[in-house]
């Protein structure tokens, strides 16, 4: 499996480069995140949500990657001001190696709520 898009996506995420992140996602990407009530479908739907997140998050630090035949999972840390949380992203890749499905899992819950509150105040 070609992971060039995954590596470029994570580098863009660490730079907080929205366009760079989106360029490594399939047009029909599906995002499931604790920061939205339902699944977001397509790059146009993701853009404002991810842009808002990048405005409030200070850093993403990737710690470990796990790989299967058509997916990659990443364990990482997130810092937003004095808030720190752990995250796991599950990325299902298409044949071109673009991310076509992304499921975001964050913990602990109080930190997730605090980041969501920061997003609400920033909008």
Residue map of PLM features:
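C-terminal and inter-domain tail/linker signature
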Residues: 1-123
């Amino acid at each position: 499996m070609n992971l060039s898009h995954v590596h470029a996506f994570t580098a863009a995420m660490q730079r907080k480069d929205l366009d760079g992140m989106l360029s490594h996602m399939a047009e029909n990407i599906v995002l499931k995140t604790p920061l939205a009530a339902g699944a977001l479908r397509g790059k146009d739907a993701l853009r404002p949500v991810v842009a808002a997140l990048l405005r409030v998050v200070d850093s993403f630090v990737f710690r470990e990657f796990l790989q299967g035949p058509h997916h990659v999972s990443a364990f990482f840390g997130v810092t937003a001001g004095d808030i720190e949380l752990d995250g796991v992203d599950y990325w299902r890749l298409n044949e071109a190696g673009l991310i076509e499905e992304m499921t975001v899992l964050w913990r602990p819950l109080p930190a997730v709520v605090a980041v969501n509150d920061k997003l609400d105040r920033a909008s």
